[in-house]
A protein has these predicted regions:
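Membrane-interfacial loop-to-transmembrane alpha-helix junctions, especially the N-terminal start
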Residues: 28-42, 114-120, 180-187, 369-381
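Aromatic-rich transmembrane-lumenal/periplasmic boundary elements in polytopic membrane proteins
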Residues: 226-317
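Membrane-embedded catalytic interface detector for glycan/lipid assembly enzymes
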Residues: 59-80, 94-222, 239-253, 325-327
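N-terminal "leader" segments that precede or initiate the main folded domain
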Residues: 1-105, 188-193, 216-241, 419-423
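Central hydrophobic cores of alpha-helical transmembrane segments
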Residues: 36-42, 184-194, 232-239, 359-364, ...
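Hydrophobic, aromatic-rich transmembrane alpha-helices
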Residues: 14-25, 166-176, 357-369
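Long extracytoplasmic/lumenal interhelical loops at the membrane interface
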Residues: 293-353
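Hydrophobic alpha-helical segments
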Residues: 168, 335-423
Length: 423
């Protein structure tokens, strides 16, 4: 009863915040990055709780190694802290978003390709070029992940970097076009299929759709077009979930699990509630630590790009500590990794104080990309890195981190020069 009451209050507050942000995304002349972040938090942290009451609490018979999540999901104190945590973050995002909405000219949405067009167009087709010159093109006649295609890790890393760079440049080129016709829409459709096929993973489709959405809302001024997307976006999200179900049941089924259940695997993929409750339960109820010392994996998150050869005692990535705790296996012997979340990462590092710290850190991170002189490319990168902080592991997105650092340095230099010239 207490769990249901806590969840109901959390869902009521968060649904109101998400509804306001969703409406503001489409009906304000300028879309703030924070509103899309609110929707992502709601999808990953609140929707799974709704599914607990409408579809059922997962038993994890499919992914049986996640049965360790169940005690935390049933513990009243853990659920109470989780609900407080999510409400705290959502309200922080709401108040920040409301203050930003009062300033309708705080970012620059105009992006002129100019002299960069030829290099960006080359970057768009870079993944195909790499496939051809590497001799791996025949391996891509099937839709599968890198393991099924027999690709080595080095090539997969390079190919992923090229895919991310390609997607970034394509999004800027496509939505930087003032007049988009049906021919342009066809190109968008074909391009998305091609990168999805090359990647062989579902996350690239979700990433592409989110980047397209943000770029569209940042550049499209036609109210009718924005209103149409406002109405059909939930259908597109449902289609993405259906594609994920198809992928897990047809493309990459788990043959080594019992009583295969697509719903449970979707919960594992899209939900971050269970893993966050797991961390809260381990630390707050059982008194067990996930990391070795406070701030350890925050440090590894920020400095992940430093090679271990240079820093031998460098902490591992957070997902490795998390997975080690879940599987009770040493980090050096992990068979795979559990997808992390900024929510549980901050709690794992700082305990209860990590809840307000994460809310503040998320706001500060968003604000970095919402300042007055932030251009469309930097805002787009900021969005992706916010999503990574919320739902992924940072090491896969090295190319975006490098691009972000370059653009932030460029913005700082430009701002300093403008100050000197005006003084």
């Amino acid at each position: 009863m207490i769990i249901a009451l806590c969840d109901a209050l959390m869902l009521l507050i968060c649904s109101l915040v998400a509804g306001i942000s969703y409406k503001r995304m489409f009906h304000n002349s300028i879309t703030s990055l924070v509103d899309l972040v609110v929707i992502v938090v709601y999808m990953f942290m609140c929707l799974p709780v709704i599914f607990n009451y409408t579809v059922g609490v997962p038993t994890y018979d499919t992914a049986y190694w996640y049965k360790v999540f169940l005690p935390g999901m049933a513990d009243e104190g853990t659920v109470f802290l989780y609900d407080i945590y999510v409400v705290l973050v959502m309200l922080a995002l709401y108040f920040y978003g409301t203050s930003r909405a009062k300033n309708d000219d705080f970012v620059s949405n105009d992006f002129k390709v100019g002299k960069w067009r030829w290099s960006m167009e080359l970057a768009v087709i870079l993944p195909l070029i790499l496939l051809i010159i590497s001799g791996n093109l025949p391996r891509y006649t099937i839709y599968a992940d890198s393991l099924a295609r027999g690709l080595n890790d080095s090539f997969v890393f390079i190919e992923n970097c090229s895919l991310f760079l390609s997607l970034f440049c394509f999004t800027l080129l496509y939505f930087g076009t003032s007049e988009r016709t049906k021919r342009h829409l066809f190109i968008l459709f074909i391009y998305t299929i091609v990168i999805a096929w090359i990647s062989g993973k579902r996350f690239i489709v979700a990433l592409a759709l989110i980047m397209y959405l943000f770029a569209f809302l940042s550049t499209e001024k036609n109210a009718d077009k924005r209103d149409r997307l406002y109405k059909i976006l939930p259908i597109l999200v449902a289609a993405l979930v259906a594609f994920s179900g198809f992928y897990m049941s047809v493309i990459k089924p788990l043959t080594n699990t019992i009583n295969y259940n697509v719903y449970e695997m979707l919960r594992v993929d899209f939900g971050r509630d269970d893993v966050t409750k797991y961390v809260i339960y381990q630390m707050n109820v059982l008194g067990k630590q996930i990391v070795d010392y406070p701030g350890e994996t925050i440090l590894s998150f920020i400095l992940f790009f430093i090679p271990r050869q240079i820093w031998p005692t460098k902490p591992f990535q957070h997902y490795q500590y998390l997975t080690s705790s879940i599987l009770r296996v040493p980090i050096t012997q992990l068979p795979a990794g559990t997808t992390p979340s900024g929510f549980e990462m901050f709690f794992a590092n700082f305990g209860l104080i990590g809840m307000p710290l994460f809310a503040l850190a998320l706001i500060a991170f968003i604000k970095l990309f919402d300042s007055n002189n932030t251009t469309m490319p930097l805002r787009l990168l900021g969005l992706v890195l916010c999503l990574v902080l919320l739902t992924q592991s940072i090491d896969v997105y090295l190319i975006y981190v490098v691009l972000t650092a370059v653009l932030l340095i460029r913005r700082a230099i430009k701002g300093r020069n403008e100050c000197e010239s005006s003084s």
